């Protein structure tokens, strides 16, 4: 288990080119090819994971299944994102299409949250860069819809994440970016957007 540090930024579309030039000037390079990412988030009927995240409680977790729709070789990752007093870490396991279908139908049982069913679908485009030991991801064209609901909401802003192990100093890199740090969860943001009006 490796704890990690995450910092998130909101960037307006009109500032994206400036941001990319900035990170390129300090030595950031492409880590992977850009790709489309799809995640289905699970929660219990009371949305306790959502509520814990909104309130910033520790420990808390999010459960999702992630895949990359445009990949020729389709695969699915069952992921647990866990936040604790000690730090954050992620546990994931590759699962088959059959197992994914079973989880969507039957749900996932969690010791703390009980039976969790699919709640929210999120799809977006992600770019991957790296600077020293800090991984930088840029998420654009973020779309949300409640599971089994055709109503789609889009996010106009761009989300940037800086991620590194807890032993690395991320603050020095973060200070080079004149953008606002935020607490942000795609799961919570999607639920909020889709519940407006």
Residues covered by each model-derived region:
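Phosphate-end processing signature that detects enzymes handling 5′-triphosphorylated RNA
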Residues: 1-197
């Amino acid at each position: 288990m490796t704890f990690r540090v995450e910092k998130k930024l909101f960037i307006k579309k009109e500032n994206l080119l400036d941001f990319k030039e900035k990170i390129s000037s300090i030595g950031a390079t492409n880590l992977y090819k850009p790709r489309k990412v799809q995640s289905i988030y699970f929660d219990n009927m009371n949305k306790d994971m959502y509520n814990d995240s909104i309130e910033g409680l520790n420990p808390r977790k999010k459960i999702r299944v992630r895949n990359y729709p445009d990949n020729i070789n389709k695969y699915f990752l069952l992921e647990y994102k866990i936040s604790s007093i000690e730090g954050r870490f992620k546990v994931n396991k590759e699962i088959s299409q059959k197992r994914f279908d079973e989880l969507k139908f039957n749900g996932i049982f969690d010791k703390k949250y009980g039976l969790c069913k699919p709640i929210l679908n999120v799809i977006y485009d992600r770019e991957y860069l790296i600077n020293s030991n800090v991984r930088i991801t840029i998420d654009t064209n973020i779309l949300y819809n409640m599971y089994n609901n055709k109503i789609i909401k889009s996010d106009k802003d761009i989300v940037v994440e800086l991620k590194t192990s807890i032993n690395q100093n991320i603050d020095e890199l973060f200070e080079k970016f004149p953008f606002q740090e935020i607490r942000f969860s795609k799961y919570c943001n999607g639920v909020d957007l889709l519940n407006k009006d």
